[in-house]
Amino acid sequence: MANSLNSMNSVAEILEALPAEETQHMLRVGRLVDLFTRKLQSYSLVKERFDERNNFGSAAFYHDIGKAWIPLGILTKPDRLTEQEMHVIRKHPVFAQRLFDQIRLGLISGIPGHLIQLAADSAMYHHEWWNGTGYLYGISYDAIPLIARITTVCDAYDAMTSSRIYRESHSHDHARQELKQYAGIQFDPELVRVFLAADVGSAFFSDALLSHL
C-alpha cells in the first residue's frame, strides 16, 4: 500500500499522499457536483434537506480519498493499467470505508462532522452502477445514495474531459454521448437527463474559465 492508516492522524496528511493529478480531479468533481446539485434543485429532483444538499459538493470532494492507499506506481503509471492493476484500483472504496470508520471513532480528524456521512457515501458508492453491475457492493437504483449517483455522473464526465497520464482529453460532445449511452446502465437516467438538459458540463467550463480571468 502507498500508506498505512496507522501512520496518519489527519485527512490533510492523507490528501498530501495523493498525486496532484488526483487531488485536482477531486476538486473538479466537488465543484461539478456543487453546480449539478444546484441545477437539480431547480428541477425539483433533490429531495434531501436543504442544508444537506448544499453540502453535496464539499462532501463529493472526498470521493477518491481511498486512492491514498493505492501504490503510486499504479496511480502515476503513464500507460494503460493491466487487469491486475485495475483490480487494485477498484479497492479504493474499501480503503475509503476503513478510513471513515476511523474518522467516526475519532482516530483521524479533518472532515467536518456534518460532511462525514455524505462524504462516506460518495467515496464508498460512486462506482456502483444504476443496473447493479458496478463495484464493490453490487447495489442498484435508489439503493445507491443520491450523492453517490450524482458523483458517478460528475466523476465520469470529468474523467472523460480531462487529460490523463496515458491519453488526451475527450470533447464535451463525446462525454455527453457517453453519458447518454450509459444512462439506465451505469448512470441514473433521470440525473443524466438533467445533466444534459441543463448543459452542466458547458456551465462548469464557463465557470472555470471565468475563475481564471
Tell where the protein language model's regions lie, with residue ranges.
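Histidine- and acidic-residue-rich, metal-dependent catalytic cores
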Residues: 2-213
